[in-house]
């Protein structure tokens, strides 16, 4: 069970990084970032079951879920604002911070 959790976590992390690097759409990049956060939480739970009591891993997991929810809400609000102004959510067309 331990190895399966780590393999699934590594797979989610690789898919998330690949999606983050190759995506041109902001929403797709946010979804890839959420996959990375899910891989982190799966690692916390898997490793806490092996090395420590479960409470420590669950506390860190709840913290990561809270950070991921705040990141998703902020990212979607920014993507919606850029879509309203630029009519596109492509990352390469979003040059709002350039002088």
UniProtKB/Swiss-Prot annotation:
InterPro entries: NADH_UbQ_OxRdtase_chain4L/K (IPR001133), NUOK/Mnh_C1-like (IPR039428). It comes from the Eukaryota. It catalyses: a plastoquinone + NADH + (n+1) H(+)(in) = a plastoquinol + NAD(+) + n H(+)(out); a plastoquinone + NADPH + (n+1) H(+)(in) = a plastoquinol + NADP(+) + n H(+)(out). GO terms for molecular function: oxidoreductase activity, acting on NAD(P)H, quinone or similar compound as acceptor; quinone binding. One of its GO terms (biological process) is ATP synthesis coupled electron transport. The chain crosses the membrane at residues 1-21, 31-51, 59-79. The keyword Amino-acid biosynthesis does not apply. Its EC number is 7.1.1.-. Belongs to the complex I subunit 4L family. NDH is composed of at least 16 different subunits, 5 of which are encoded in the nucleus. This is NAD(P)H-quinone oxidoreductase subunit 4L, chloroplastic.
